[in-house]
């Protein structure tokens, strides 16, 4: 059984088709990197996976459960059962480019919030879980009472990763998690993500970090103008690209 199956996703904005039949399958422990130029549809695809963007067609299955959908008035798909959507989203934790932490909550409360209010965990258990995952991403206890504005960008993104981990999801989705960081802070976030990959966590990430993608991925997808132009193992995609578009992309992005 796959941890995540996404089949034939289409997304349009008016007459502009951003995604044209993109599919992905992730088994337990897979790390799938999605690469491509800006505007290729990478982030839109990831947001369609957990219905932050509503696709116009396609199927999404997490484990043994397929998201039930119905046609919307504007040609998009809508969740047929909001409770099922919430349940599936809780199994698909997402880490965003711009952290998306709650500015009015402390670090600890940011991580505790969803386990308590979505998973209905006992608060004491949620606090213990939050502290466990904050320690896992290298944030000391003294940080937990601070607010996001008091942290560096790298620290904020590590809090966001701890928040995602606290949901103990089946799959973690990363949407360009380092692109908003100063260059000197990128390494600390990539180190945490590499540790997660080495633990066997199932991850789908959109990234511009080509060396990192080559190192940690089990599978790489090159997206171009809303379609999968090429995919394969890291050695195939980075070492022996078949598509001229992929060769051009790598020539401009490999460091």
From Swiss-Prot:
Pfam families: ABC_tran (PF00005). The keyword Coiled coil does not apply. It is a peripheral membrane protein. SMART domains: AAA. The keyword ATP-binding applies. GO terms for molecular function: ABC-type amino acid transporter activity; ATP binding; ATP hydrolysis activity. Keywords: Amino-acid transport, ATP-binding, Cell inner membrane, Cell membrane, Membrane, Nucleotide-binding, Translocase, Transport. Residues 4-250 form the ABC transporter domain. InterPro entries: AAA+_ATPase, ABC_ATPase_HisP-typ, ABC_transporter-like_ATP-bd, ABC_transporter-like_CS, MetN_ABC_transporter-like, P-loop_NTPase. ATP binds at residues 38-39, 41-44. Part of the ABC transporter complex HisPMQJ involved in histidine transport. Shows ATPase activity. Responsible for energy coupling to the transport system. The HisPMQJ complex is composed of two ATP-binding proteins (HisP), two transmembrane proteins (HisM and HisQ) and a solute-binding protein (HisJ). This is Histidine transport ATP-binding protein HisP. It comes from Pseudomonas aeruginosa (strain ATCC 15692 / DSM 22644 / CIP 104116 / JCM 14847 / LMG 12228 / 1C / PRS 101 / PAO1). The gene is hisP.
């Amino acid at each position: 059984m796959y941890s995540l199956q996404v089949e034939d996703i289409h997304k349009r904005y008016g007459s502009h088709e951003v995604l044209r039949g993109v599919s992905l399958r992730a088994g337990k422990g897979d790390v799938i990197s999605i690469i491509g130029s800006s505007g290729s549809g990478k982030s839109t695809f990831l947001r369609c996976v957990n219905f932050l963007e509503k696709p116009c067609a396609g199927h999404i299955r997490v484990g043994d459960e397929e998201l039930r959908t119905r046609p919307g008035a504007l040609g998009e798909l809508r969740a047929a059962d909001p409770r099922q959507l919430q349940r599936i989203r809780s199994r698909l934790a997402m880490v965003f480019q711009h952290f998306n932490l709650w500015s009015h909550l402390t670090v600890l409360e940011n991580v505790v919030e969803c386990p308590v209010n979505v998973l209905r965990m006992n608060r004491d258990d949620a606090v213990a879980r939050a502290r466990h995952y904050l320690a896992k991403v290298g944030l000391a206890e003294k940080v937990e009472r601070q607010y996001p504005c008091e942290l560096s960008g790298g620290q904020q993104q590590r809090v966001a990763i701890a928040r995602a981990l606290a949901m103990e999801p089946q799959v973690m989705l990363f949407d360009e998690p380092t692109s908003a960081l100063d260059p000197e802070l990128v390494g600390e976030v990539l180190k945490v993500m590499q540790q997660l990959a080495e633990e066997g966590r199932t991850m789908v990430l959109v990234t511009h970090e080509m060396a990192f993608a080559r190192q940690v991925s089990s599978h790489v997808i090159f997206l171009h103008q809303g379609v999968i132009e090429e995919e394969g193992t890291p050695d195939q995609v980075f070492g022996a690209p078949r598509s001229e578009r992929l060769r051009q992309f790598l020539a401009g992005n490999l460091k």
